[in-house]
């Protein structure tokens, strides 16, 4: 539900956006991961939509840094700092990482979601940023919307939707 004066900012594949209240950040995920940063006291947030855990060539991440967890998450941290939020003022929620390629005879494709989840968790732990909530794995894609007025996330998955209110 849009509140007065708010607008939806879509976060595309291999993309990142930062905004403040009353904006809404939204993305749709399959095996990709949506990383949601939110600073409740400042009503500022950022969201990245990355596709893969690491750049196997080490070259593509220079052109497409939000395609990979290893470059997207540090850039999210930098974006939060640029918007005036220091570590300790924000927390993180993680979404996506579904197994979307069942029946495909490729272990790489079958494990993309799982690898994305594990890599994102490891980078967040190394960065000492609290991961307070996640809805990851499974076989269903998701659409997530971060409402920057209060930090709630609307999660749509498997024909159902629910609001997640945990922000600290």
Curated annotation (Swiss-Prot):
Signal peptide: none
Entry's Gene Ontology BP terms: chemotaxis
Record-stated family: Belongs to the CheD family.
Keyword Hydrolase among UniProt keywords: yes
One Pfam family named in its UniProt record: CheD
InterPro entries the UniProt entry points to: CheD-like_sf (IPR038592), Chemorcpt_Glu_NH3ase_CheD (IPR005659), Cytotoxic_necrot_fac-like_cat (IPR011324)
Molecular functions (GO terms): protein-glutamine glutaminase activity
Gene3D superfamilies: 3.30.1330.200
Protein name stated in the entry: Probable chemoreceptor glutamine deamidase CheD 2
Swiss-Prot/TrEMBL catalytic activity: L-glutaminyl-[protein] + H2O = L-glutamyl-[protein] + NH4(+)
Keyword Isomerase: no
EC number: 3.5.1.44
Function summary: Probably deamidates glutamine residues to glutamate on methyl-accepting chemotaxis receptors (MCPs), playing an important role in chemotaxis.
Keywords: Chemotaxis, Hydrolase
Domain of life: Bacteria
